[in-house]
Structure formats: structure tokens, C-alpha cells
């Protein structure tokens, strides 16, 4: 008689072990292992089996290839993020917090494609058909070629996709679907992994662009096994406060284009719309205030004008606070230490708070100079002209380094009527912006 083998799986990350573990060695989750039954083990073994290869290896120079066919999503900002549009046969995963606009955006994409006489299927496991139609009426998304399906049974959904010649498909959401062949609840690791694998095969074999909406965990990552993100061609993530109009779409993985671009949307009565004059969303045009400084950051090929806001106040307790929203806290601590060392400013007795307007997160060092200028402005209670921008990276020895692609930043300043720029070196090309050189942090204090 064959010996019975057991297999346990972590419900957080999908890690498998031949014995039960109190703590997952991969994701460090406690008491997350459950024993798989025979059917689940067969599915797992099927997924692990390599696809047999009949052909021999071929020289890469001898392989004939075709360019990836892309088509417009009808949403200009989404096309920018995807690198020029949706690829035929592409599998896209879209995540974001509840209410941020995932379903709204993809319903508008589906409607836009259907308007161009393309047959599109929208599968919802969360809303009834009448609820979806009410939302479609509000968003003006009623199209004859847009088909709705309210179903969570995966074999039924798969049969529907295979029975019709759909151009694209939207799954809302992957965590609500289940396959009867796997005896676990919808949204479990096994269910999500198997159904995503089937969707990947459908997308490639039938040349259908498929969008999957994914829920997120309380830590902010997409719920489900990590293999989910490896299976898909692109991972898109919505950022933004649901209570505000602005939404930012980022690409964390894209097999068909760059991952450095971002898309900017505004939530209006007619749903998510591509933001016009994007830079104007991130800075104030009102009278200048203490603690505010302007900078220009690059997100992919796009230059954005941002307002850095600082608040410096006397410390009420022994240990001062350093908090940043949209800016790296470790880099903020470094800049504060630099001001204390080089300029002898007693920030060790002050709380320092930094905020990047618009809710955007910046990581490029070229914004360092604006952060320092905003801190000095708040500390000295001096206003900075809101037609002046600060561009430059600050090194540990107090020197200011040139921001890359400076001409693109200055051109964006010209478009919005800015007059002056503080930077370490004057630009090589002519510009209407008056550029003032400051190659060290001490020069900023003199200028202020």
C-alpha cells in the first residue's frame, strides 16, 4: 500500500511544505498553513509540470519575429502607462484600494472599445447586471457590443469566452471567482493561481486582451500568491485618496513597454477622465506662504511641477519628529543633518514635517533643493516667490548637483509662466527662465 503523502500550503503567499509549519518561512505569516486535499495537489502538480518541448534550440539570430500589435484603450493616460496602448493577447492586472476607480476605468475602456465595433465581455462577480447598467448609464457607457456576465463559476465563464469571438475581456474581480475542481473558497491561493493560469492560456491562444481586477491586502499589496504577478504581462496600480479627485496610475511591470510612466486621472461626475494640464494639479497659484517651494520632477517622459510644503515647529518633547508624506523619510533625515552640520541651524530642537502636494510620491534626488528651501522658509518665516523653482540634488558634503534632463524641466516651467530657477549650473540651451547659480547649500541661505 502506497504511503500517504501530505502537502500544506500557506494561504498568504502560496508556499508549500510537506509538513505543517507554525510560521511561513517565505512570508513570515503565523498559522497560515492548511492541508491540501488530493484534487488540490493534482492541480498544483499539473501547474508545476513543464510544458514538453518538441523542437530543438534555435539561434536567436535565425528566429523570425513580428512586432507586438497594439491598439488604443480609448483612454489617453492609460495608453501612456501601457507604452502605446493595449497589446493583443496581453494579460493585465489592475490593483488599488477600494473606491479608487478600478472598475470605473475598465468599464470606460470596455465601452470605448465596444464603441469602435469591437466585441467586449465584462465579467462581474461583485455586482448584478442591473447595478452595472446603472453605473454604465451614469458614465455614458451604453454600447451594443459591450456584453455583461454576472457569474463567479469559472467553467461557465471560460465556456462563454470560448464560445464567442471577443476582442477583449474584463474580470471584476479575480478574488470572487471559483473553480469547482478545487475544493477551497473563492479568493484562496489555489483558486486564484489556477484561474489566473487558465486566463493566461486563454489570452495567448485566442489573442484576447484580458484585464483582471485584483483586491489589495491591508499592507497595500495585491491579494493572492506572488505567482499571480509573475503570470500576467503587466501590473498596474492605482494610487490616490478616494475622497479626492486626483488618481495616479503606475506600472510596476510591463512586458510591452516601460515601467517609468504614470497616468493622471480625475474623478468627475462622468467617471474617471484623463487629467488635462497635469502639472497645474500639483501646485498652488495663490499668494506664496512660508514653508512652500516649487520643484519639477520627471515621471518617465513627463515633467510635473510640484509644490513641496514644510512645517518646522519647536519640539514639545525630548525627541523631535521627522515625518514625510510623499517623500522618503530617510532622505529627509539626511538633509536635516546636513543643514545642522553645514549651516548650524538648530533643527535638533524642532519637529520637521514635509508634504508633497497632490498626494504624489517622489523618489528622484533632483527635488532635494526644494525640500531644503521649504524647510528654511518655514524655519525663518520667509516667503518664497511662487514663480521660482528649485532644481538640484544635494550631496552629503553640501554641494548641489545638476538635475538630469534640465531642459525638459525648464520648458515645463515656461509653459506655466515661471520666471526664475535656482540651480547649480546654467542650462546649455537658451531659455526665458532667469537662472541663478547655487552650487552649495550655503548659497541658498544667502539667496533667501
Curated annotation (Swiss-Prot):
A motif (RadA KNRFG motif) lies at residues 253-257. A zinc finger (C4-type) spans 10-27. GO terms for molecular function: ATP binding; ATP hydrolysis activity; ATP-dependent DNA damage sensor activity; damaged DNA binding; zinc ion binding. Its EC number is 3.6.4.-. It is an enzyme of class 3 (hydrolase). The keyword DNA repair applies. Residues 351-448 are annotated as: Lon-protease-like. SUPFAM superfamilies: P-loop containing nucleoside triphosphate hydrolases, Ribosomal protein S5 domain 2-like. Pfam families: AAA_25 (PF13481), ChlI (PF13541), Zn_ribbon_LapB (PF18073). GO terms for biological process: recombinational repair. ATP binds at residues 96-103. Keywords: ATP-binding, DNA damage, DNA repair, DNA-binding, Hydrolase, Metal-binding, Nucleotide-binding, Stress response, Zinc, Zinc-finger. It comes from the Bacteria. Belongs to the RecA family. RadA subfamily. Has a putative N-terminal zinc-finger, a middle region with homology to RecA with ATPase motifs including the RadA KNRFG motif, while the C-terminus is homologous to Lon protease. DNA-dependent ATPase involved in processing of recombination intermediates, plays a role in repairing DNA breaks. Stimulates the branch migration of RecA-mediated strand transfer reactions, allowing the 3' invading strand to extend heteroduplex DNA faster. Binds ssDNA in the presence of ADP but not other nucleotides, has ATPase activity that is stimulated by ssDNA and various branched DNA structures, but inhibited by SSB. Does not have RecA's homology-searching function. HAMAP family: RadA_bact. This is DNA repair protein RadA.
Amino acid at each position: 500500500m502506497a504511503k500517504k503523502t501530505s502537502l500544506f500550503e500557506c494561504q498568504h503567499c502560496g508556499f508549500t511544505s510537506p509538513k505543517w509549519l507554525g510560521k511561513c518561512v517565505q512570508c513570515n505569516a503565523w498559522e497560515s498553513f492548511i492541508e491540501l486535499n488530493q484534487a488540490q495537489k493534482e492541480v498544483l502538480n499539473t501547474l508545476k509540470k513543464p510544458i514538453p518541448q518538441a523542437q530543438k534550440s534555435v539561434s536567436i539570430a535565425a528566429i523570425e519575429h513580428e512586432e507586438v500589435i497594439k491598439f488604443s484603450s480609448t483612454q489617453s493616460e492609460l495608453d501612456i502607462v501601457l507604452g502605446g496602448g493595449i497589446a493583443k493577447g496581453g494579460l493585465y492586472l489592475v490593483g488599488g484600494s477600494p473606491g479608487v476607480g478600478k472598475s470605473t476605468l475598465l468599464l470606460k475602456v470596455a465601452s470605448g472599445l465596444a464603441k469602435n465595433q469591437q466585441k467586449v465581455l465584462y465579467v462581474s462577480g461583485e455586482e448584478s447586471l442591473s447595478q452595472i447598467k446603472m453605473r454604465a448609464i451614469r458614465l455614458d457607457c451604453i454600447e451594443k457590443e459591450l456584453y455583461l456576465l454576472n457569474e463567479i463559476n469559472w467553467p461557465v465563464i471560460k465556456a462563454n469566452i470560448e464560445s464567442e469571438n471577443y476582442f477583449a475581456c474584463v474580470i471584476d474581480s479575480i478574488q470572487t471567482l471559483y473553480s469547482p475542481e478545487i475544493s477551497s473558497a473563492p479568493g484562496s491561493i489555489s483558486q486564484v493561481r489556477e484561474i489566473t493560469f487558465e486566463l493566461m492560456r486563454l489570452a495567448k491562444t485566442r489573442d484576447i486582451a484580458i484585464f483582471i481586477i485584483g483586491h489589495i491586502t491591508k499592507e497595500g499589496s495585491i491579494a493572492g500568491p506572488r505567482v499571480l504577478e509573475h503570470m500576467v504581462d503587466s501590473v498596474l496600480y492605482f494610487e490616490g485618496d478616494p475622497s479626492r479627485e486626483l488618481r495616479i496610475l503606475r506600472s510596476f511591470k510591463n512586458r510591452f513597454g516601460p515601467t517609468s510612466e504614470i497616468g493622471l486621472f480625475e474623478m468627475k461626475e462622468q467617471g474617471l477622465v484623463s487629467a488635462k494640464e497635469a502639472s497645474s494639479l500639483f501646485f498652488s497659484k495663490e499668494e506664496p506662504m512660508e514653508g512652500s517651494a516649487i520643484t519639477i520632477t520627471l515621471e518617465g517622459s513627463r515633467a510635473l511641477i510640484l509644490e513641496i510644503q514644510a512645517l518646522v515647529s519647536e519640539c514639545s518633547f525630548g525627541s523631535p519628529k521627522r515625518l514625510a508624506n510623499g517623500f522618503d523619510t530617510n532622505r529627509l533625515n539626511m538633509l536635516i543633518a546636513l543643514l545642522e552640520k553645514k549651516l548650524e541651524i538648530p533643527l535638533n530642537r524642532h519637529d520637521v514635517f514635509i508634504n508633497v502636494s497632490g498626494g504624489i510620491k517622489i523618489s528622484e534626488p533632483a527635488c532635494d533643493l526644494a525640500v531644503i528651501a521649504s524647510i528654511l522658509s518655514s524655519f525663518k518665516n520667509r516667503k518664497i516667490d511662487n514663480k521660482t523653482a528649485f532644481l538640484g540634488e544635494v550631496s552629503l558634503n553640501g554641494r548641489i548637483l545638476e538635475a538630469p534632463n534640465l531642459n525638459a524641466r525648464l520648458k515645463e516651467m515656461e509653459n506655466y509662466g515661471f520666471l526664475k530657477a535656482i540651480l547649480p549650473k546654467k542650462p546649455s540651451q537658451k531659455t526665458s527662465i532667469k537662472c541663478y547659480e547655487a552650487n552649495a547649500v550655503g548659497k541658498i541661505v544667502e539667496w533667501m
